[in-house]
Amino acid sequence: MPKLKTKSGAKKRFKVTGTGKVVSAHAGKRHGMIKRTKKQIRQLRGTRILFKTDGDNIKKYFLPNA
């Protein structure tokens, strides 16, 4: 059976760390920022580590070769 291909959309959005955790950018920063406080905007910077169950699903279905 051939190897599963990595989903190209997931390849652009998620990264697997050396310890196997899945990292992604925070959601909610594309538009509508005028409604948010400065603190909310500041907290959306950088990346976040996904919960273990979500990360496991991402690795299993979308990043099979990671």
Curated annotation (Swiss-Prot):
InterPro entries: Ribosomal_bL35, Ribosomal_bL35-like, Ribosomal_bL35_CS, Ribosomal_bL35_sf. Signal peptide: none annotated. It comes from Nitrobacter hamburgensis (strain DSM 10229 / NCIMB 13809 / X14). It comes from the Bacteria. Transmembrane segments: none annotated. The keyword Ribonucleoprotein applies. PROSITE patterns: RIBOSOMAL_L35. Belongs to the bacterial ribosomal protein bL35 family. The keyword tRNA processing does not apply. The gene is rpmI. GO terms for biological process: translation. This is Large ribosomal subunit protein bL35. Keywords: Ribonucleoprotein, Ribosomal protein. One of its GO terms (molecular function) is structural constituent of ribosome.
